[in-house]
């Protein structure tokens, strides 16, 4: 096998509650991504996005990686890894520094982002991303790219995302147990946004709802920047459990019934359509109308979308997203999900699938690959920025090496006092 060359190949690893997806992307001569390898395997060892069994998780990752390597014809050495879970926290913050040479340079941007992320967080959390929203130079607001601009004071408005220290450490441990290095850990809804949202939607205002197996992840964008993120601990696994309980069928059959026959809006399901439902033990299978199945599924989707709507209202952005809602993730594929969401949100809703990728497009243009493709696109952006510097995941990049914490603190004090 050929070795994966840094700068030519990018790997995304989506370690989800229901499945592990490994994607290998090759950077083409024109700077585009071509997906050349895909590996998927049922996830064992995670619950609601958090590792609960190291050995089972390692085995699932290894099998997905092996499959992707075989398809791509290369050996994988490192990957961009997604993270999700109810332990994710976020807040908006800002920082202010003096501009040393009256012209903003990369060091000034690094210092102001460091200042902005200097917020009090619990000891068991760590900063995952510091995502720049916009900058203020003196009294000039709305600056998106401050580099090279003149002024005496630089302010950054940022969205800070934190995660549980042990959750991220366990994910890294599992990946390294498979012989891989971790290029970066990325919030999964941020990755999905890279692959399914258009620039126009992010400018106008949009809410991404990524419905996975264990959690539903929310990201709100306005004026081209991320403004709010949240996690709701209800997703596809709850739908499967509802079917298993209501139909008294084993979980593996409930999952198959959900994927093949379920509908999120009962009025769209044909009353005359029937399905066979396997029973528990040696009991014979039973027949059930598809509409009766939909009546089991619809209340859970209704609850989920109502919780998303409540989060939108709590965030204060409900009236600031004229581009509406974009649903993605494996659980968003169900028939009737978009129609039910439109009834609840009273705004435009569409199904988001990855775009702007080449290669195995017939396969990856599917909501279940949104996070995986987004991880590739995130990696492509970092590679084009030199892969040399990331302020806890911010979009800012520099060719300068990252200084030690004490040295950065010393520079910050010198620059401000």
Curated annotation (Swiss-Prot):
Q: Which domain of life is it from?
A: Bacteria
Q: Where in the cell is it found?
A: Cell inner membrane
Q: Which GO terms describe its cellular component?
A: cell division site; cytoplasmic side of plasma membrane
Q: Which Pfam families does the record cross-reference, listed alphabetically?
A: FtsA, SHS2_FTSA
| Alphabetical keyword list | Cell cycle, Cell division, Cell inner membrane, Cell membrane, Membrane
Tell me if Ribonucleoprotein is a UniProt keyword of this record.
no
Against SUPFAM superfamilies, the record matches this protein to: Actin-like ATPase domain
State whether keyword Metal-binding applies. Answer: no
Q: Record's InterPro entries? A: ATPase_NBD, Cell_div_FtsA, FtsA/MreB, SHS2_FtsA
Gene Ontology biological process terms in this record: cell division; FtsZ-dependent cytokinesis
Q: What is its main location?
A: membrane
Q: How does it sit in the membrane?
A: Peripheral membrane protein
Quaternary structure and partners: Self-interacts. Interacts with FtsZ.
NCBIfam families linked to this entry: ftsA, PRK09472.1
Biological role stated in the UniProt entry: Cell division protein that is involved in the assembly of the Z ring. May serve as a membrane anchor for the Z ring.
Family that this chain belongs to:
Belongs to the FtsA/MreB family.
Q: What is this protein called?
A: Cell division protein FtsA
> In which organism is this protein found?
Pseudomonas aeruginosa (strain ATCC 15692 / DSM 22644 / CIP 104116 / JCM 14847 / LMG 12228 / 1C / PRS 101 / PAO1)
């Amino acid at each position: 096998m050929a070795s994966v060359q840094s700068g030519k190949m990018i790997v995304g690893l989506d370690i989800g509650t229901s499945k592990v997806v490994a994607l290998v992307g090759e950077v083409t001569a024109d700077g585009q991504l071509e997906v050349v390898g895909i590996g998927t395997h049922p996830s064992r060892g995670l619950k609601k996005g958090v590792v609960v069994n190291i050995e089972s998780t390692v085995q699932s990752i290894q099998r997905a990686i092996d499959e992707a390597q075989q398809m791509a014809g290369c050996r994988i050495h490192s990957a961009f890894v997604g993270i999700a879970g109810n332990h994710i926290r976020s807040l908006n913050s800002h920082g202010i520094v003096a501009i040393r040479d009256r012209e903003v340079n990369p060091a000034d941007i690094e210092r102001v982002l460091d200042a902005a992320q200097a917020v009090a967080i619990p000891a068991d959390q760590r900063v995952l991303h510091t995502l720049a929203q916009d900058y203020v130079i003196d009294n000039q607001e709305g600056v998106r790219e401050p580099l090279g601009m003149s002024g005496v004071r630089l302010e950054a408005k940022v969205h800070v995302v934190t995660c549980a220290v042990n959750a991220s450490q366990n994910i890294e441990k599992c990946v390294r147990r498979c012989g891989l290095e971790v290029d970066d850990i990325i919030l999964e809804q941020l990755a999905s946004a890279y692959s399914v949202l258009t620039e126009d939607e992010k400018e106008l205002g949009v809410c991404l709802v990524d419905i996975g197996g264990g959690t539903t992840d929310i990201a709100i964008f306005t004026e081209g920047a991320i403004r709010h993120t949240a996690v709701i601990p209800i997703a596809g696994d709850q739908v499967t459990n509802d079917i298993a309980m209501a139909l008294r069928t084993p979980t593996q059959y409930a999952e198959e019934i959900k994927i093949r026959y379920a509908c999120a809006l009962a009025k769209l399901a044909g009353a005359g359509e029937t399905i066979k439902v396997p029973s528990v033990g040696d009991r014979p299978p039973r027949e059930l109308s598809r509409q009766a199945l939909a009546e089991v599924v619809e209340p859970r989707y209704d609850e989920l979308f109502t919780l998303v709507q409540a989060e939108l209202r709590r965030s204060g952005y409900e009236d600031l997203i004229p581009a509406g809602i974009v649903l993605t993730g494996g659980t968003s594929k169900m028939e009737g999900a978009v129609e039910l969401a439109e009834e609840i949100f009273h705004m435009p809703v569409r199904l988001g699938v990855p775009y702007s990728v080449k290669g195995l497009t017939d396969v990856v243009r599917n909501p279940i690959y949104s996070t995986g493709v987004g991880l590739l696109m995130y990696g492509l952006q970092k590679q084009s920025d030199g892969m040399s510097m990331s302020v806890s995941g911010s979009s800012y990049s520099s060719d300068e090496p990252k200084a030690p914490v004490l040295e950065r603190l010393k520079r910050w004090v010198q620059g401000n006092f």
